[in-house]
């Protein structure tokens, strides 16, 4: 037996939090009375008793024969080549707002009937494949709701029906500014089984209306009311309420904004703070954490902070083999965080609903794991970071980025992440009234 390379021990008040990056298991022990014993068990695993059994079960101690890097590589390949197919579709690149930080160019025009037919043929092809058991369609843009009736509704309805016919699980979701989500459209969203939304606000009402307006017409109240309507009329909906922030926005009274959402729907809303990318060089972790805590204390769904994750073996959904991002003109991309210039094109959709991929790009993407480089393989954070996404690593290799390591730009350090993960696990166990191990205290 040997100690895992991915054990972390973080002092917290009068205790030490013990965390393993591969298993995601976390517990705490008394700093004064128990930690030295636990550490000795882990560092020199001799004999068999209840303590060593617990540590082995939770991967703090592993078999001599276990290669943790191979375990991570194997699970990375499994997650990238799994049996779900994810389509991200842009009905348009038009938008009813003009946010100053948006990286997209508002090209006029919507998806044509011809391209819609190609997409329906693609969906037929995907759902008839024996190895595909789930289809996920994410609507993106531009503002996708500009062409809800013309594009989103008919394609989603088609996909829902053909998935039911072929016994394929179907999910659809949308990233939207939320302004056009009328009561009538919410009813139509129920019909196509859309239950997940990402909707953005920019700080408080005053700041938001300066950034997000329709030719000067304020949008804040309309968006908040639409979010409340979605939670009211679509049972079990899940909303990611993205708050784009700068240091100035973090200092606002975010609680006043969040209090606009009734208590009974807050469990369906996860508040996700994301820094405006033009201010990525700035830092204010203290205010960021204060606001994350505030959202949690107000009853919103739990959210982890930082760029780290548990049991996620690839960085981005776009790194998966069964993924395609289809623009309104039928051209195919991978990354949803870049523009739609020729440089980022990865293929094109044929009349028969087949994606003609750029084979060179696919070979580069899938020949090995993105973290299969010296820096990542030697890093203790690998299981909870899983390296760069393909696009960031490509930009770095082509000299268009100075770094590919997320840790170098992470506003929340790893110790803080682990402490907060531990506290989140405790809170969830209490809310579910699970039997809580004394080790969580």
Predicted regions and their residues:
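N-terminal [4Fe-4S]-dependent radical SAM core
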Residues: 3-28, 49-88, 441
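Hydrophobic "anchor" residues
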Residues: 26, 331-332
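Conserved glycine-rich "GG(E/T)P / GGGxP" loop and the immediately following alpha-helix
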Residues: 88, 92, 105-272
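Iron-sulfur (Fe-S) cluster-binding segments and ferredoxin-like electron-carrier domains
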Residues: 102-114, 339-342, 382-418
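C-terminal accessory region of radical SAM enzymes
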Residues: 284-311, 337-386
């Amino acid at each position: 037996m040997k100690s895992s390379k991915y054990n972390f021990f973080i002092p917290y008040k009068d205790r030490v939090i013990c965390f393993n990056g591969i298993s995601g298991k976390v517990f705490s022990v008394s700093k004064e009375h128990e930690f030295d014993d636990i550490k000795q068990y882990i560092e020199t695993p001799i004999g068999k008793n209840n303590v060593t059994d617990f540590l082995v079960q939770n991967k703090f101690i592993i078999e001599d024969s276990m290669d943790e890097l191979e375990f991570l590589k194997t699970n990375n390949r499994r997650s990238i080549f799994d049996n779900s197919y994810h389509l991200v579709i842009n009905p348009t690149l038009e938008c009813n707002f003009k946010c100053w930080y948006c990286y997209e160019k508002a090209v006029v025009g919507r998806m044509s009937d011809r391209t819609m037919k190609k997409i329906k043929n693609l969906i037929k092809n995907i759902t008839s494949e024996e190895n595909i058991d789930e289809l996920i369609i994410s609507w993106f843009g531009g503002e996708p709701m500009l062409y809800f009736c013309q594009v989103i509704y008919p394609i989603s309805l088609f996909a829902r029906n053909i998935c039911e016919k072929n016994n394929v699980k179907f999910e659809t979701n949308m990233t939207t500014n939320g302004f056009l989500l009328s009561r009538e459209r919410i009813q139509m969203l129920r019909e196509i089984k859309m239950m997940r939304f990402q909707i953005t606000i920019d700080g408080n009402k005053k700041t938001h209306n300066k950034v997000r307006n329709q030719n000067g017409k304020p949008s804040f109240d309309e968006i908040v009311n639409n979010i409340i309507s979605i939670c009211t009329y679509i049972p079990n909906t899940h909303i990611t309420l993205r708050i784009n922030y700068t240091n100035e926005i973090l200092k606002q009274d975010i609680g006043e904004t969040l209090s606009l959402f009734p208590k009974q729907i807050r469990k369906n809303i996860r508040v996700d703070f994301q820094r405006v990318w033009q201010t990525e060089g700035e830092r204010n972790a203290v205010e960021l954490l204060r606001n994350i805590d505030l959202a949690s204390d107000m009853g919103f769904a739990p959210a982890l902070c930082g760029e780290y994750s548990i049991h996620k073996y690839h960085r981005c959904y776009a790194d998966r083999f069964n993924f395609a991002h289809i623009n309104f003109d039928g051209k195919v991309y991978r990354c949803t965080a870049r523009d739609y210039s020729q440089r980022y094109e990865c293929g094109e959709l044929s009349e028969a609903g087949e994606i003609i991929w750029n084979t060179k790009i696919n070979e580069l993407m899938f020949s090995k794991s993105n973290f299969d480089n010296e820096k990542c393989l030697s890093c203790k954070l690998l299981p909870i970071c899983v390296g760069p996404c393909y696009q960031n690593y490509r930009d770095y290799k082509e000299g268009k980025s100075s770094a590919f390591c997320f840790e170098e730009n992470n506003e929340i350090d790893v110790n803080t992440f682990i402490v907060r993960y531990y506290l989140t696990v405790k809170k969830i166990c209490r809310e579910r009234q699970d039997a809580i191990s004394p080790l969580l205290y």
